[in-house]
């Protein structure tokens, strides 16, 4: 008996296409897994349930009638709650949007539906994607499937946890400064931030519009490539959308899984992203991965990107400045929460103030205040203007590095998953958790995080980040898949096969969810 929740999305797609399983069976298996473990993990804010089963049954009916369907038809998928869905609440992890049902789908959600994937539900996240631990969700934290007392990363901890807990084979996330790649690192999953503009942002509730990017979360590099192919492409509804014709990321991943894929590839190790403050086990697994790459024919080159030293400081001026503008739309007048003032006249201004005070959490308020200050008269040039100059220097550092190497690598995060509360009241410690991922967002280049082992001191996942030049996303998939193959040969299988069993009472196979 095969547990369908343990299969990759590619394997599920093959079984569905061959008629060996139905989409209803695959969907029911994952809904069963959610029911069994999500009370502990809390990856989901909303589960589609019967709607997902109806969608799956409709796809099965069309397949049975002989209709030609896409390669991913019938495969379940989870969706980060930052993305608008016209049939499920879209809260962005905030009380101010509790219960809000958008009148439209985000473009990436529409593309999922057009490709006949089956949405399982919406995943938890830090409020308005502001955080690195999912502790800032208004609906409670998500827990790391490797250790339920530790964080799953953020802001997209729900999507990463859903995938690594085998509640979904695939998920969509968003990445503003590492919100896909950092959760992937600490949960043992794969996450990709595409080139800025490569995937539509229309319908993604904006945090920082010049930094946000939607991307795939999965358990394998190939699965990420397959989902990337579904969501990529130009969208006239997004003014920042690129008109590029993108190659198949899945084909790039398949090419990387072949022998010789790493021969003569130049891999740059960024000196500034592998220094003090990095956990010993993270550095050890990173160095071991470099050894595997070199042993397979890659050339390892140390490169310097001096401006990366200022990336965190610049990011935490640019992001709050843009967020303070984007979040001004939550005014209680047109949609979302509305709170009347406790006393005094009920005016639009006072209702807005009362609503924002009740509806926004402390981290969101902190960043709105910081961003408003950075944009204020007399401080704009000193803070926001200077941060944008640093951003330009970082882009130049990337350009110079990519003249010497094909990809850049670093640890995806400086540490493994930390315990709940450990950094919650120390904003700087929390912000520094994104030190390796932020530069790619500031420059708009693509980045991939993939698991490279468990840290010896705590037995928790460690991730490696790959970065490529803008528009060269396919390069990440080729090199990422090649490294994944080398690592799994060394481990004797996927890293997530070593993850703890979350539910002793869960039936691993049932009449509805096994073949």
UniProtKB/Swiss-Prot annotation:
NCBIfam families: gatA (TIGR00132)
Summary of the function given for this chain in its UniProt record: Allows the formation of correctly charged Gln-tRNA(Gln) through the transamidation of misacylated Glu-tRNA(Gln) in organisms which lack glutaminyl-tRNA synthetase. The reaction takes place in the presence of glutamine and ATP through an activated gamma-phospho-Glu-tRNA(Gln).
Reaction catalysis annotation: L-glutamyl-tRNA(Gln) + L-glutamine + ATP + H2O = L-glutaminyl-tRNA(Gln) + L-glutamate + ADP + phosphate + H(+)
Top EC group: ligase
Molecular-function GO terms, alphabetical: ATP binding; glutaminyl-tRNA synthase (glutamine-hydrolyzing) activity
Protein species of origin: Leifsonia xyli subsp. xyli (strain CTCB07)
Keyword ATP-binding tagged: yes
PROSITE patterns named in the record: AMIDASES
Any one GO biological process: translation
Self-association and partners: Heterotrimer of A, B and C subunits.
Keyword Nucleotide-binding: yes
Protein's name according to its UniProt entry: Glutamyl-tRNA(Gln) amidotransferase subunit A
EC number: 6.3.5.7
Gene Ontology CC terms: glutamyl-tRNA(Gln) amidotransferase complex
Family: Belongs to the amidase family. GatA subfamily.
Active site: 80 (charge relay system), 155 (charge relay system), 179 (acyl-ester intermediate)
Keywords: ATP-binding, Ligase, Nucleotide-binding, Protein biosynthesis
């Amino acid at each position: 008996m095969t547990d369908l929740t343990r299969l990759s999305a590619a394997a599920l797609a093959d079984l569905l296409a061959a008629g060996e399983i139905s989409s209803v069976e695959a969907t029911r298996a994952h809904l069963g897994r959610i029911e069994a473990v999500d009370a502990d993990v809390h990856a989901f804010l909303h589960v589609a349930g019967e709607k997902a089963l109806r969608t799956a049954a409709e796809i099965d009916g069309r397949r049975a009638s002989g209709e030609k369907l896409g390669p991913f038809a019938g495969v379940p998928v989870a969706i980060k709650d930052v993305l608008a869905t016209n049939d499920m609440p879209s809260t962005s992890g905030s009380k101010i949007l509790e219960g809000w049902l958008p009148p439209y789908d985000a473009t990436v959600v529409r593309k999922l539906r057009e490709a006949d994937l089956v949405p399982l539900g919406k995943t938890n996240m830090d409020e308005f994607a502001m955080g690195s631990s999912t502790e800032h969700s208004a609906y409670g934290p998500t827990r790391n499937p490797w250790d339920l007392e530790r964080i799953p990363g953020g802001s997209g901890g729900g999507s990463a946890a859903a995938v690594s807990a085998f509640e979904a084979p695939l998920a969509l996330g968003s990445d503003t400064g590492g919100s896909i790649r950092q959760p992937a690192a600490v949960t043992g999953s794969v996450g990709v931030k595409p080139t800025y503009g490569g995937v539509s942002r229309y319908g993604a509730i904006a945090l920082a519009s010049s930094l946000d990017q939607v991307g795939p979360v999965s358990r394998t590099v190939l699965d990420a490539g397959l989902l990337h192919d579904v969501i990529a492409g130009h969208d006239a509804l997004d003014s920042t959308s690129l008109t590029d014709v993108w190659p198949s990321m899945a084909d790039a991943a398949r090419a990387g899984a072949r022998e010789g894929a790493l021969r003569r590839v130049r891999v740059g190790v960024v000196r500034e992203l592998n220094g003090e403050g990095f956990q010993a086990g993270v550095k050890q697994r990173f160095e071991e991965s470099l050894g595997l790459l070199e042993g397979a024919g890659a050339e390892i080159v140390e490169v310097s990107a001096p401006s990366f030293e200022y990336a965190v400081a610049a990011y935490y001026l640019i992001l709050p400045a843009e967020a303070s503008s984007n979040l001004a739309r939550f005014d209680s007048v047109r949609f979302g929460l509305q709170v009347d003032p406790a006393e005094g006249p009920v005016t639009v201004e006072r209702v807005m103030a009362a609503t924002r005070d009740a509806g926004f959490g402390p981290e969101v308020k902190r960043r709105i205040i910081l961003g408003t200050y950075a944009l204020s008269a007399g401080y704009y040039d000193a803070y926001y203007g200077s941060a944008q100059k640093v951003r330009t220097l970082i882009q130049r550092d990337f350009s110079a590095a990519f003249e010497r190497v094909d990809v850049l690598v670093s640890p995806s995060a400086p540490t493994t998953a930390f315990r709940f509360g450990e950094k919650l009241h120390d904003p700087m410690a929390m912000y520094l958790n994104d030190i390796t991922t932020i530069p790619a967002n500031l420059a708009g280049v693509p980045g991939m995080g993939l698991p490279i082992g468990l840290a010896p001191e705590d037995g928790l996942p460690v991730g490696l980040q790959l970065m490529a030049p803008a528009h060269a996303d396919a390069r990440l998939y080729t090199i990422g898949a090649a490294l994944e193959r080398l690592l799994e040969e060394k481990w004797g299988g996927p890293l997530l096969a070593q993850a703890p069993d979350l539910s002793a009472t869960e039936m691993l196979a049932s009449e509805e969810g096994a073949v």
